[in-house]
Amino acid sequence: INSINAEVDLRLRYFELAKPWLEPLVGNELAMQLRINLSIQMPRDDSSLLPVHADTWSGDSPYEVVVWVPMVDCFKTKSMYLLPPEAARRLRSEFARRAGSSSEDLFQAIESEVVWLEVPYGQVLIFDQGLPHGNRVNEEPETRWSMNCRFKGVFTPYGDKKIGEFFEPITLRAASRNGMSYQYPEVS
């Protein structure tokens, strides 16, 4: 993945995959994660599991979305699951009561409500990383290969991951560039 991330135009090409949907969903002045993540989930491999979580639970900004690009057909346990918004709201309202529960206990409590995403090769998924999501052991006979990267509005609040450290602007308008580099004249 390091050599892939070293490709000069990788970030721009990745952005272009989702640009038609990102702009109406997130805005037209966007910050993009500096490094694109690669996920490999082999059949029956329990070493690459991502337990149920929402990225916001660990300090990410609720203003972010994830662009998930499968490099194979993803379905059932070869994919990921997502808790729909209404079920996520119910979970949030009872979250304090579940404090101390394991992620497995939490998954068992919501398992009947999660949606296993079917995303064919060649399609892109954009999802709200504030919704609980994760994966389970891949019980399908094929390996899942996917990439993911976060995007957010440049001028929306940041969580623990800051601009310049984790994010970098990928689209800025002329007025924003001028404003960001503007220096007030000195007055004595």
Feature names for model-found ranges:
Residues 2-15, 66-69, 90-97, 143-146:
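Short N-terminal helix-initiation segments at or just after the protein's N-terminus
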Residues 23-27, 72, 130:
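Hydrophobic/aromatic-lined pockets within catalytic cores
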Residues 88-188:
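Conserved double-stranded beta-helix
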